[in-house]
């Protein structure tokens, strides 16, 4: 536990110290920043804000985790577990980096196409499964304390889980500070679970990422001086999925990650309903003012018809939802 605390503090300090230099480099090189193509007018002022800040906190968390674990952990099984989780973080970080690179440096607005991104995500998921999950012999998922054996179909579950939550966190990263603190809340919860289980290797990874993210948040809260970009959000979502698998508590991510589930569900419902009503009535209709869900809240509160919410109000509400959901999971696991 002490080692995790030290690693978290180091990650925080390095991330917080390095981020201003990253931002200054972006500005000095006059690199094109984040582009805004949204109907939320208050976001237009953010155009040009440096992005890809996730590169910094991912490098910091990965480096600190590796250095501390190599010098302090002698158990080869623990080192294999750490390398497994870090591998999926790095792979998805590279995918996100490529997507951001095409948008910013090559001025390709959509970056990777949806098919290209999905293909790379599936390839990364397959590597994670065959190199780190399959050798462990795991082929079942924990469903509220019961082990449901999936056999070979566990492969498809892993792919769905990793790809799904990486994209879900990516959708959540739409307003200042929302994704970074939402992930911190999720990681703190998994840190408690890892501690209770005695999985201090996983706890070390969690601690370093929390520290690095908090260092990043100093520059990502409203008004944001930097965004994490796809390089950060895709990697963080994949990390949460991998941690839930490593701790054998897969089901908990549906509740701990309720914010990501809400954001993704809102997009899926909106698109499906729009297509259905367009086919039936000749014009598409919407359930939400705008998706993902945080934009619906910005434009009119919960009802979508009330007073507009500020980004801080949206953040506070969704962070609160995530915190309550996380407490519920801990209560289910260790109280009831």
Curated annotation (Swiss-Prot):
> What's the main place this protein lives?
membrane
The cellular location(s) given in this protein's UniProt record come to:
Cell membrane
Q: Mind telling me which Pfam families this protein's record contains?
A: Glycos_transf_4, MraY_sig1
InterPro entries on file: Glycosyl_transferase_4, PNAcMuramoyl-5peptid_Trfase, PNAcMuramoyl-5peptid_Trfase_CS
Task: Provide the E.C. number(s) assigned to this enzyme.
Answer: 2.7.8.13
- Could you say which cofactors this protein requires? Mg(2+)
- Annotated pathway: Cell wall biogenesis; peptidoglycan biosynthesis
Q: Indicate whether Zinc appears among the record's keywords.
A: no
Sorted alphabetically, the keyword list is: Cell cycle, Cell division, Cell membrane, Cell shape, Cell wall biogenesis/degradation, Magnesium, Membrane, Metal-binding, Peptidoglycan synthesis, Transferase, Transmembrane, Transmembrane helix
- Bilayer topology: Multi-pass membrane protein
UniProt keyword Cell membrane present: yes
Record field: catalytic activity: UDP-N-acetyl-alpha-D-muramoyl-L-alanyl-gamma-D-glutamyl-L-lysyl-D-alanyl-D-alanine + di-trans,octa-cis-undecaprenyl phosphate = Mur2Ac(oyl-L-Ala-gamma-D-Glu-L-Lys-D-Ala-D-Ala)-di-trans,octa-cis-undecaprenyl diphosphate + UMP
The record lists the membrane-crossing segments as 3-23, 53-73, 78-98, 118-138, 143-163, 174-194, 200-220, 226-246, 251-271, 316-336
| Top-level enzyme category | transferase
Q: Enumerate the Gene Ontology biological process terms.
A: cell division; cell wall organization; peptidoglycan biosynthetic process; regulation of cell shape
Q: Which GO terms describe its cellular component?
A: plasma membrane
| Primary role | Catalyzes the initial step of the lipid cycle reactions in the biosynthesis of the cell wall peptidoglycan: transfers peptidoglycan precursor phospho-MurNAc-pentapeptide from UDP-MurNAc-pentapeptide onto the lipid carrier undecaprenyl phosphate, yielding undecaprenyl-pyrophosphoryl-MurNAc-pentapeptide, known as lipid I.
Q: Record's HAMAP family?
A: MraY (MF_00038)
Could you say which protein family the record assigns here? Belongs to the glycosyltransferase 4 family. MraY subfamily.
> What is the protein's given name?
Phospho-N-acetylmuramoyl-pentapeptide-transferase
Q: Which organism is it from?
A: Streptococcus pyogenes serotype M6 (strain ATCC BAA-946 / MGAS10394)
């Amino acid at each position: 536990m002490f080692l995790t605390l030290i690693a978290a503090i180091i990650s925080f300090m390095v991330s917080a110290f390095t981020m201003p230099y990253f931002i200054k480099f972006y500005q000095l090189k006059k690199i094109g920043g984040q582009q805004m193509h949204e109907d939320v007018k208050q976001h237009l002022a953010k155009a040009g804000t440096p992005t890809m800040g996730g590169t910094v906190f991912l490098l910091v968390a990965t480096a600190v985790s590796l250095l501390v674990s190599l010098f302090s952990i002698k158990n080869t099984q623990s080192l294999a577990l750490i390398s497994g989780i870090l591998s999926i973080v790095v792979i998805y970080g590279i995918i996100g980096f490529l997507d951001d690179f095409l948008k910013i440096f090559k001025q390709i607005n959509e970056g990777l196409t949806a098919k290209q991104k999905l293909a790379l995500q599936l390839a990364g998921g397959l590597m994670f499964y065959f190199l780190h999950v399959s050798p462990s012999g795991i082929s079942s998922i924990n469903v509220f304390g019961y082990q449901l054996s999936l056999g070979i179909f566990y492969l498809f579950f892993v792919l769905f889980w990793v790809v799904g939550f990486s994209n879900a966190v990516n959708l959540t990263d739409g307003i200042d500070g929302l994704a970074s603190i939402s992930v911190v809340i999720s990681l703190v919860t998994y840190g408690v679970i890892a501690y209770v289980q005695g999985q201090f290797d996983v706890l070390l990874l969690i601690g370093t990422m929390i520290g690095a993210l908090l260092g990043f948040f100093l520059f990502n809260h409203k008004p944001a001086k930097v965004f994490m970009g796809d390089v950060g959000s895709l990697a963080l979502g994949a990390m949460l999925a991998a941690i839930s698998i490593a701790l054998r508590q897969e089901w908990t991510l549906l509740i701990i990650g309720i914010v990501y589930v809400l954001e993704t569900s809102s997009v899926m419902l909106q698109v499906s309903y729009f297509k259905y009503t367009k086919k039936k009535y000749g014009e598409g209709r919407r359930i939400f003012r705008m998706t993902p869900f945080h934009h619906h809240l910005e434009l009119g509160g919960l009802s979508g018809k009330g007073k507009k919410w500020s980004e801080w109000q949206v953040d506070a509400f969704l962070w609160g939802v995530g915190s309550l959901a996380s407490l519920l999971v801990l209560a289910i696991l260790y109280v009831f």
